A protein has these predicted regions:
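Short, exposed beta-strand-loop hairpins at the edges of beta-sheets
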Residues: 133-158
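Extracellular C-terminal loop/segment signatures of secreted glycoproteins
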Residues: 102-112
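Transition segment at domain starts
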Residues: 34-72
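Short, well-ordered beta-strand segments enriched in hydrophobic/aromatic residues
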Residues: 75-84
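Short proline/glycine- and polar residue-rich coil/turn motifs
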Residues: 112-121
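Bacterial Sec-dependent N-terminal signal peptides
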Residues: 2-5, 18-45
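Divalent metal-coordination and catalytic microenvironments
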Residues: 65, 92-95, 143-145
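Acidic glycine-/aspartate-rich tracts in secreted/extracellular proteins
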Residues: 84-86, 97-101, 148-150
Length: 164
């Protein structure tokens, strides 16, 4: 009887070891771990054009945005470059909204200053709330630049956040 008990104990031990090992390996998903890590870093990017403005506008202007988002402190640091706008941008900003949908402004409009032209660069630091960070990670934030000719937006581009 003692031999049978030892055999059952050994089988249960091996089964438990295999089960827990399998559970540990299947629970690890690096991509989701990075998205949910409270100190994860993300690379921000996005291309803007007049066709993405809702409703679309006529123009050959484009813009690109590049930067980082730090989920530890909520800071998104970006640099926006634009070219061929109808004139100098008078304002810009970040908005919550899916592609093709107008959304609400987050934070303040960018204070772009004076002396700008139809081609230029602007850098910004914005602190996101947890709701805005979730929208960023799911592709539901966009940026827009407005000009005197198109005060509701001349170019618009969705933001993409890629875990580093």
């Amino acid at each position: 009887m003692k031999t049978r008990t030892n055999l059952v104990s050994k089988v249960l031990f091996v089964f438990s070891f295999v089960f827990l090992g399998a559970l540990a390996f299947t629970a690890c998903d690096k991509k989701n771990e990075d998205k949910n890590n409270s100190n994860a870093m993300f690379t921000i990017s996005g291309n803007a054009s007049s066709s993405q403005v809702v409703p679309s506008v006529t123009g050959s202007g484009t813009a690109t945005i590049a930067g980082t988002y730090n989920s530890g402190n909520g800071q998104m640091i970006t640099t926006t470059n634009w070219t061929n706008l109808s004139g100098a941008p008078i304002t810009g900003g970040f908005y919550m909204g899916a592609a093709g949908v107008n959304g609400a402004l987050i934070g303040d409009l960018w204070s772009l200053g004076t002396g700008l032209t139809a081609t230029g660069t602007f850098s910004d630091t914005t602190t996101l709330t947890s709701e805005q960070a979730t929208a960023l990670k799911s592709g539901n934030l966009y940026y827009s630049l407005a000009t005197a000719a198109n005060p509701n937006g001349e170019v618009r581009g969705q933001l993409t956040a890629t875990p580093q």
